[in-house]
From Swiss-Prot:
The gene is rsmH. This is Ribosomal RNA small subunit methyltransferase H. Specifically methylates the N4 position of cytidine in position 1402 (C1402) of 16S rRNA. It is an enzyme of class 2 (transferase). GO terms for molecular function: rRNA (cytosine-N4-)-methyltransferase activity. It is found in: Cytoplasm. Keywords: Cytoplasm, Methyltransferase, rRNA processing, S-adenosyl-L-methionine, Transferase. PANTHER family: 12S RRNA N4-METHYLCYTIDINE METHYLTRANSFERASE, S-ADENOSYL-METHYLTRANSFERASE MRAW. Its EC number is 2.1.1.199. It catalyses: cytidine(1402) in 16S rRNA + S-adenosyl-L-methionine = N(4)-methylcytidine(1402) in 16S rRNA + S-adenosyl-L-homocysteine + H(+). Signal peptide: none annotated.
Length: 298
C-alpha cells in the first residue's frame, strides 16, 4: 500500500467510525465505473471510500484527510483494499491536484460524529475539554487562542458571520467579561448566561452557532473550500464528476456558485439531493446534508 501516513497512534484506541451520508446517491452521482480512479478528499473513517471501492471492479481511490486520526482509522477499516488505495495526509486546499487524473472527486464537508464524540478534540460543548477544535493538530491556532485573545468586536463579527448568531454582540461581551476561558463547558456556560431564558432553553443549545463559528475560523474552512472549488475541476478527466456534501448554508452557497461558475463544469443537480426519511431515521446527521454534483466538460 502506498501511504504518506506515518503515525504511532494505537488503532485499537480509535473509535473513528463513520456512517456514510447519502452513500447510494454519491455512488450513483459519481457514476463509478470499473477501473476508475477516484479522489476522496475527506476520507474520515473510510465509509464513502469503501462504497466507491465496492461499486465496480478494479477501482482505485486516493484518500486525503487533514486529521491523522482519520487516516489511521481509514487505513485499518480499508485494509482489505490496501493494493487499491493510497492515503495522503493533507488539507484538501493544500493537496496538489494532478491535472486530468480522476474519474470522480468527493468531498464530505463539516465535522464528523467522531470529532463531536471525542471530548478531548474540543468540538463539543457537551463534555468538558480544552478549547481546541483543530481538525489538523499540526495547526497552531486553537479555539482558546481566539476566545481569549481576540477583541470583543472581532468575536462578535465571527459569531455573526460564521455562526449566523443574532446575539453575537451580547455573547462576545459576556465572553470578554469572563475570560480567560479554558474549557468547552466554561465557554458554553458563558454563552448560555448571556442570552434570554427562552433562547437558553430552546431546541438548539445557545452555544451551537458560536462553536460552529469557532470551528470554521480555527480550521479556515470556508477559505479552504473556496480553494478546493477552484483547483479540483482541473483534476477531473473529461466526463469525470465531482460530488460535494455540505451541511449548512455557509458551505452550500459557495458550493452551489463554485460549481455553477466553473467554466470546466456542467452542473447535474438543479436542486441539491437530500436524504430520504429512512436514512434520516437511521442517521440524524443526514437531515441537513445537501449533495451537489457536476461533470467536467469534454
Amino acid at each position: 500500500m502506498k501511504s504518506d501516513l506515518e503515525t504511532p497512534l494505537n488503532l485499537e484506541e480509535l473509535a473513528f467510525s463513520h456512517i456514510s451520508v447519502l452513500g447510494r446517491e454519491v455512488i450513483e452521482g459519481l457514476a463509478v465505473r470499473p477501473g476508475g480512479h477516484y479522489l476522496d478528499v475527506t476520507v474520515g473513517g473510510g465509509g464513502h471510500s469503501r462504497l466507491i471501492l465496492e461499486a465496480a471492479a478494479d477501482v482505485r481511490v486516493t484518500a486525503v484527510d487533514q486529521d491523522e486520526d482519520a487516516l489511521v482509522a481509514a487505513n485499518k477499516n480499508l485494509a482489505e483494499y490496501s493494493d487499491r488505495i493510497q492515503f495522503i495526509y493533507s488539507n484538501f486546499a493544500d493537496y496538489e491536484f494532478p491535472p486530468n487524473t480522476f474519474d470522480g472527486i468527493l468531498a464530505d464537508l463539516g465535522v464528523s460524529s467522531y470529532h463531536l464524540d471525542q471530548a478531548e478534540r474540543g468540538f463539543s460543548f457537551r463534555q468538558a475539554a480544552n478549547l481546541d477544535m483543530r481538525m489538523d493538530r499540526g495547526r497552531s491556532l486553537t479555539a482558546a487562542d481566539v476566545i481569549n485573545n481576540w477583541d470583543e468586536a472581532e468575536l462578535a463579527d465571527i459569531f455573526f458571520k460564521y455562526g449566523e448568531e443574532r446575539l453575537s454582540r451580547r455573547i462576545a461581551r459576556r465572553i470578554v467579561e469572563r475570560r480567560p476561558l479554558h474549557t468547552t463547558t466554561e465557554l458554553a456556560d458563558a454563552i448560555a448566561s448571556s442570552v434570554p431564558p427562552k433562547y437558553r432553553y430552546g431546541r438548539i443549545h445557545p452555544a451551537t452557532r458560536v462553536f460552529q463559528a469557532l470551528r470554521i475560523v480555527v480550521n479556515d474552512e470556508l477559505k479552504s473550500l473556496e480553494t478546493f472549488l477552484d483547483k479540483a475541476p482541473n483534476a477531473l478527466v473529461p466526463g469525470g464528476r465531482i460530488a460535494i456534501i455540505s451541511f449548512h448554508s455557509l458551505e452550500d452557497r459557495p458550493v452551489k456558485h463554485g460549481l455553477r461558475n466553473s467554466p470546466l463544469l456542467k452542473v447535474l443537480t438543479k436542486k441539491p439531493i437530500i436524504a430520504q426519511e429512512e436514512e434520516i431515521s437511521n442517521n440524524p446527521r443526514s437531515r441537513s446534508a445537501k449533495l451537489r454534483i457536476a461533470e467536467k466538460l469534454v
